[in-house]
């Protein structure tokens, strides 16, 4: 049985995922108005959208530094402030340059939270429930996406020029996150590995695992002592970590070449391309958010029973088929907007059940305690670099090559993902972090 306090701490930390998802998707309802308001060229517009992702890449790359130096909890308090400043600032920005700067600052929070929050949850969760608890982060990402879509739709009905309200409303959950972080303890593994505060760590582990906390303490300390024998143990480039590093890079790469962020960012534009009106496009986008949430909830029930690998195998097959059909509908011409909407909803269902649910769980598990923050940074950095490239290039590519070629590229990439899952991806369900370390690292 999972202790209630562990669930509560995980839910609070997962609110970082809610802000991550809200910030990622809220721009979809405002992006066309922003282009009109500041008379932006396509290149300037692409830069305006992708600058948040550049901030995200930066936040992901440097997120491990505060996570290891001042702790997971204090780092997330700083991130909550960043979200608050970014949301309020973009809502009142008086010129394009300031708006772009504040979008970058908001992106820093998204990137850093994608590194630190999953680490924290994986480090306090018991092995039997780690998948379900870490997936709360992804659940909150898709909940944030859905709420942002719904918020955009409702605000769009209430105001004639709604984009500032769309962006500014995120200040409310940012403030709630900041307040709730006061009630969360520091990660016990961080306390042992970076501060040698064994007594403080023991108090938290006792709340997590009343019967087995002493053995868990012993396992963490033993793993730390083993790593300290290797003078290069803290370097992610140590040959011991080559396999988990490769897994993290490939997993994050395939996550983005599925086309998910292109659809999240540009869903209304895609539906307009498929023939839907503006209001119908926004409402269909909300439907995508609802499907995303529903199938993430379904994955929560199966990730610790079926395992990570089976979810990925099923999802990869579904993504290949749905992306191929979307590509075909664009190739065939005479596009039916409702048909494309249904296909993309099925696509989202397969993505949410597999890649969307598994990525933050899997990457947070596969690295040893000593380099977990660095490993999570590597995976997050790869994820956001690819997201930036796709978000920046998607409007240009669809304009020059059309929807058919664009979605066919995503489909082919999912064929490669299927091979990766089949041939390389290990199963991690039900294993302690120290057991996974012994399996995946070279000694």
Regions found by a protein language model. Give the residues of each.
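Alpha-helical transmembrane bundle of multi-pass membrane proteins
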Residues: 1-197, 225-443
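Solenoid-repeat scaffolds in large eukaryotic assemblies
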Residues: 200-204
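Short, well-structured alpha-helical segments
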Residues: 213-225
């Amino acid at each position: 049985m999972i202790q209630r306090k562990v669930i509560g701490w995980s839910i609070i930390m997962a609110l970082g995922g809610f802000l991550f998802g809200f910030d990622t998707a809220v721009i979809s309802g405002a992006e066309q108005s922003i282009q009109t308001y500041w008379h932006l060229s396509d290149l300037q517009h692409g830069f305006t959208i992708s600058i948040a992702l550049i901030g995200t890449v930066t936040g992901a790359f440097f997120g491990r530094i505060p996570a290891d130096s001042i702790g997971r909890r204090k780092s997330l308090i700083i991130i909550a402030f960043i979200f608050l400043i970014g949301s309020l600032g973009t809502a009142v920005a008086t010129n394009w340059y300031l708006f772009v700067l504040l979008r970058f600052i908001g992106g820093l929070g998204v990137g850093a939270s994608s590194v630190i929050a999953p680490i924290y949850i994986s480090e306090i969760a018991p092995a039997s429930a780690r998948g379900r608890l870490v997936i709360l982060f992804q659940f909150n990402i898709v909940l944030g996406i859905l709420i942002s879509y719904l918020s955009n739709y409702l605000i769009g009905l209430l105001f004639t020029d709604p984009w500032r309200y769309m962006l500014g409303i995120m200040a409310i959950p940012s403030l709630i996150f900041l307040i709730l972080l006061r009630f969360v303890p520091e990660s016990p593994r961080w306390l042992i590995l970076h501060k040698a505060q064994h007594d403080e760590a023991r108090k938290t582990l006792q709340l997590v695992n009343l019967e087995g906390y002493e053995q868990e303490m012993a396992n963490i300390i033993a793993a730390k002592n083993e790593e300290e024998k290797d003078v290069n143990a803290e370097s992610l480039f140590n040959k011991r970590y080559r396999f988990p590093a490769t897994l993290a890079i490939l997993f994050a790469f395939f996550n983005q070449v599925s086309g998910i962020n292109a659809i999240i960012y540009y869903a209304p534009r895609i539906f307009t391309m498929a023939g839907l009106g503006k209001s119908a496009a926004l409402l269909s986008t909300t439907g995508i958010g609802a499907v995303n949430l529903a199938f993430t909830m379904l994955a929560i029930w199966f990730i610790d029973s079926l395992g990570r690998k089976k979810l990925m195998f099923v999802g990869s097959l579904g993504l290949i088929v749905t992306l191929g059909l979307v590509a075909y509908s664009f190739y065939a011409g005479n596009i039916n907007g409702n048909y494309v909407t249904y296909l993309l909803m099925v696509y989202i269902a397969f993505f949410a059940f597999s890649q969307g649910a598994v990525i933050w769980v899997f990457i947070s598990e596969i690295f040893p305690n000593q380099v977990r923050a660095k490993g999570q940074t590597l995976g997050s950095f790869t994820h956001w670099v690819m997201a930036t490239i796709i978000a920046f290039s998607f409007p240009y590519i669809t304009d020059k090559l059309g929807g058919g070629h664009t979605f066919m590229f995503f489909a082919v990439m999912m064929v490669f993902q299927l091979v990766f899952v089949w041939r390389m991806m290990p199963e991690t369900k039900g294993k302690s972090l120290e057991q996974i370390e012994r399996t995946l690292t070279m000694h």
